[in-house]
C-alpha cells in the first residue's frame, strides 16, 4: 500500500474512507496561476482588494436602481463564516447606498440538496439580478452550468477562488472566498516547523467534494513532499462536529501513534477536540480551519493548537464592491481571495483580539 496515503478501512456513521488523493486542483485554475495567466485580471483583483481595504464610497445617485439579490448558503454549522459573510455584505451595501432586496436561505452543508435545489429554482424564477451560491459537489456544478447557460442572473460563487477551466468562455460574474490551497499551505508550513521528518499523522476531511480535495489534498501533498510526513489514515466526514468526533476516535483506535490530526473544517476540528479530550490524548496536535469565533475561543482555552484565520469580512465587502462596480459599468475581476493569518495557542490574547477586530470589522458591529 502506498505510504503516501494509507487509508483507513473502517467506515462508521456514514463516513466513507477516502479512496485516494485525487490530483489537487484537477480541472481548476489555481488562484495565482489564473492571475499570472491573465494579467488584466490581476490588475482588476488588486484594484478590488484596495477597495475592500478602503472606506466605502457611496454610489452616484444616477447609477442606483433597485436590485434583487438571492443568497443560498450552507450556514447551519458551528463555523460562523457564512453568517458573518452575509452580514458584512449587507452592511457594506448599505454604506455604498445601494438599493437592494435580499432573499436568504441557509442550509446545512452536505445535506438539504432538495431544499437547495428548490431555493435555487425559486431565485431564478424571481429573476434575481444576482445569485450568491457555492460550488462543492457535482450537483452544485450542474445547477451552476444551467444558470450560466440559460439565465440573465449574475452568479457569484462563494468560498471558491479557483476558476473552472471548462467554463473559460462563460465564467460566473465572480468567484470570491479565501483560497483554500493557500490556507492549507500555510498550515503545512507551520506543521513542518513543529515536527521532525517522518512524523505520522491523520487527516479528517470535510464531506466529499471540492473543499476536501483542495484543503485536504493540498496539505497532504505539501507535508509529504516538504517534510516527508507519513499519512496513516484519511476519513471523509459528514462535515459535522459529531462525524469529526467519531472519525477521530476511529482513526486513533487504528493508528494510535499519530503526532497530529489535520482537520479540514471548524466543525470537524471541534469534534476531534472532544474525542482527544475523552481519550486523554492531548498529546495529539489538532488544527482548526478558518479562525471563526468558535475556533478563536478554543485556541484561547488551549483546546485547539493552531488555525489559519480568514479575515472574514473581506469577502462580504468584496461582493458589495463588485456589485457597485457592475452598476457603474466598470469591469469586475473574475476572482478575489481575502487575506489569512496563522494563529496559535501561544499567541497573546492581545494579538488574537486585534485580528478578531480586523476580521470582523463589519459583522461584529
From Swiss-Prot:
GO molecular function, one term: DNA-binding transcription factor activity
CDD domains tied to this protein: PBP1_LuxPQ_Quorum_Sensing (cd06303)
Signal peptide extent: 1-21
Keywords recorded for this protein, A-Z: Periplasm, Signal
Location in the cell: Periplasm
GO cellular component: periplasmic space
Matches recorded under PANTHER family: LACI-RELATED TRANSCRIPTIONAL REPRESSOR (PTHR30146), RIBOSE OPERON REPRESSOR (PTHR30146:SF145)
Family membership: Belongs to the bacterial solute-binding protein 2 family.
Protein purpose: Binds to the signaling molecule autoinducer 2 (AI-2), a furanosyl borate diester, (3a-methyl-5,6-dihydrofuro-[2,3d][1,3,2]dioxaborole-2,2,6,6a-tetraol). This complex then interacts with the LuxQ sensor protein.
Protein name: Autoinducer 2-binding periplasmic protein LuxP
Organism encoding this protein: Vibrio parahaemolyticus serotype O3:K6 (strain RIMD 2210633)
Primary gene name: luxP
Amino acid at each position: 500500500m502506498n505510504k503516501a496515503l494509507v487509508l483507513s478501512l473502517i467506515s462508521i456513521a456514514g463516513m466513507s474512507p477516502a479512496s485516494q488523493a485525487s490530483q489537487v486542483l484537477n480541472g481548476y485554475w489555481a488562484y495565482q496561476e489564473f492571475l499570472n495567466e491573465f494579467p488584466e485580471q490581476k490588475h482588476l483583483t488588486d484594484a478590488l482588494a484596495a477597495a475592500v481595504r478602503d472606506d466605502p464610497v457611496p454610489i452616484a445617485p444616477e447609477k442606483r436602481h433597485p436590485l434583487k439579490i438571492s443568497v443560498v448558503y450552507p450556514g447551519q454549522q458551528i463555523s460562523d463564516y457564512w453568517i458573518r459573510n452575509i452580514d458584512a455584505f449587507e452592511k457594506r451595501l448599505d454604506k455604498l447606498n445601494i438599493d437592494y432586496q435580499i432573499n436568504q436561505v441557509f442550509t446545512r452543508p452536505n445535506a438539504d440538496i432538495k431544499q437547495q435545489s428548490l431555493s435555487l429554482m425559486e431565485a431564478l424564477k424571481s429573476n434575481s439580478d444576482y445569485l450568491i451560491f457555492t460550488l462543492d459537489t457535482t450537483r452544485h456544478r450542474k445547477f451552476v452550468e444551467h444558470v450560466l447557460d440559460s439565465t440573465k442572473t449574475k452568479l457569484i460563487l462563494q468560498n471558491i477562488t479557483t476558476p473552472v477551466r471548462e467554463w473559460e468562455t462563460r465564467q460566473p460574474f465572480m468567484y470570491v472566498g479565501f483560497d483554500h490551497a493557500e490556507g492549507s499551505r500555510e498550515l503545512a508550513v507551520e506543521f513542518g516547523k513543529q515536527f521532525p521528518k517522518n512524523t505520522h499523522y491523520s487527516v479528517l476531511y470535510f464531506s466529499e467534494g471540492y473543499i476536501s480535495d483542495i484543503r485536504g489534498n493540498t496539505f497532504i501533498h505539501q507535508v509529504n513532499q516538504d517534510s516527508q510526513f507519513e499519512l496513516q489514515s484519511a476519513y471523509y466526514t459528514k462535515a459535522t462536529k459529531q462525524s469529526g468526533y467519531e472519525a477521530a476516535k476511529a482513526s486513533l483506535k487504528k493508528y494510535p501513534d499519530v503526532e497530529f490530526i489535520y482537520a479540514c473544517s471548524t466543525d470537524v476540528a471541534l469534534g476531534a477536540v472532544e474525542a482527544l479530550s475523552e481519550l486523554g490524548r492531548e498529546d495529539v496536535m489538532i488544527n482548526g480551519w478558518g479562525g471563526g469565533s468558535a475556533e478563536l475561543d478554543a485556541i484561547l482555552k488551549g483546546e485547539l493548537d493552531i488555525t489559519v484565520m480568514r479575515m472574514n469580512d473581506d469577502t462580504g465587502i468584496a461582493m458589495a464592491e463588485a456589485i457597485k462596480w457592475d452598476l457603474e459599468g466598470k469591469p469586475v475581476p473574475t476572482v478575489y481571495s481575502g487575506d489569512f493569518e496563522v494563529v496559535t495557542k501561544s499567541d497573546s490574547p492581545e494579538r488574537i483580539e486585534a485580528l478578531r477586530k480586523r476580521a470582523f470589522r463589519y459583522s461584529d458591529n
